[in-house]
Amino acid sequence: MSERKTPRLLLGLIAIAVIGSAAFYLMPGVKTDASEALDNAKSSQKLQSLAELDGKAPASRKLDVQSWNTAEGAKVLFVEAHELPMFDMRLIFAAGSSQDGNAPGLAILTNAMLNEGVAGKDVGAIAQGFESLGADFGNGAYKDMALASLRSLSAADKREPALKLFSEVVGKPTFPADSFARIKNQMLAGFEYQKQNPGKLASLELMKRLYGDHPYAHSSDGNAQSVPKITLAQLREFHAKAYAAGNVVIALVGDLSRTEAEAIANQVSSALPKGPALAKIAQPQEPKASINHIEFPSKQTNLLLAQLGIDRDDPDYAALSMGNQILGGGGFGTRLMSEVREKRGLTYGVYSGFSPMQARGPFMINLQTRAEMSEGTLKLVQDVLADYLKTGPTQKELDDAKRELAGSFPLSTASNADIVGQLGAMGFYNLPLSYLDDFMRQSQSLTVEQVKDAMNKHLSTDKLVIVSAGPTVPQKPLPAPSDKPAEQPLGVPEH
């Protein structure tokens, strides 16, 4: 499923996608390997009734977030928004690939199978059922979490049957064998495609090197060896425990009263399997710094530099978000983009980002560059990082980043879809209901020294795990920095 792009500064809550978890606010971004193909295959079509409303998003406003727990143990966050006659609901389960155990790919397969069948309805009938009501269903699974979402008109004659079907899909899927085989084949085709994608190969290798035996090490999609071995019995067992009412956060936004919202939450949570929240995963061990190369025939080399970052509870979150925005999270004008692309023309783009998760997510820098200049470019990136850690941001850089945040921040609550993503993140990571205001206040009060101290506390050039993927070729010296670099970046990245 796809989501709107939102300001990079809220990384983690509104995150980037570098490692495989991301189309959801917060996870940074980590769009999983074969999951894009699955998402495309399973994306639902919008009826005109909702499509027309999508262009009429209400303006940003202060949120009055209400929260409670259902009798079954589901945590609910709700915001009334009566500007449009519709509502958005998102269920966030602690049912991502970090819960796969010895069956990598189990979480994403379970999630992908939710809307493939319920009693009396196959995948086509389910899709038609939502369409006939003007409703949208969406799903996805990532490192920490699995999602199921519903967008519906709020009128009772549309809302109630849409909720009934949604509750069946999420709570009582039948997991038909023919769909299971088809989705497995789609995933296996995705694994074959990965072999021709040096960027993906580098990403997979990086996560293994960075996380070792930790659950974050394996791709959310599993692999060509693990997926064929997964059985329907494993899906049913995983669904029974990971999709339990005690393991879900329900985010609701829209044209509903508190009474209606409570009834919806009760209906959905009572349809789920009974059970408690799953235990949180352990923190990863610090890996050894290393440099690793994957030989791949191409004109460019993919470079990934990473180390363990922070979890979502870290008190330095705001300072690191601001610091990364200046380093490489904000596109043109950042330290990395200025030195690597704008002055030397060595890359199409270079980006950095933290991906805070339940356990420590990665900090990562990624780029593609000309193969014959890959070694020099790698050293340049390391030098830029080292210099930034040594000097910190300038006052002007910090002031500019604060202004950018102040200007873009209202977009984070501009529509119901934006708000439901924020609520889901707040509930899943146990953030205070005042989180958005707190984050903005903390960010705007930061000093240069606070940003510098936070970046140095959590980052070190001596801890980098580096993976490159490309050909081994004779190296050329880098061009001197210039306002008009002689070496222009290739127009389009290879992968």
Regions found by a protein language model. Name each.
Residues 191:
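N-terminal glycine-/lysine-enriched basic segments
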Residues 79, 84-111, 123-170, 184, ...:
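M16 family metallopeptidases and their MPP-like homologs
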Residues 5-136, 149-154, 160, 164, ...:
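His/Glu-rich zincin catalytic helix
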Residues 458-462:
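Short segments within alpha-helical structural elements
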Residues 1-3:
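Juxtamembrane low-complexity tails/linkers enriched in Ser/Thr-Pro and polybasic
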Residues 43-66, 208-248, 278-284, 409, ...:
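Histidine-acidic residue clusters that define the catalytic metal-binding segment
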Residues 127, 181, 228, 236, ...:
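Generic structural signal for individual residues within well-ordered alpha-helical segments
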Residues 117-120, 170-178:
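Short, polar/flexible loop-turn hinges at active-site or ligand-entry regions and domain interfaces
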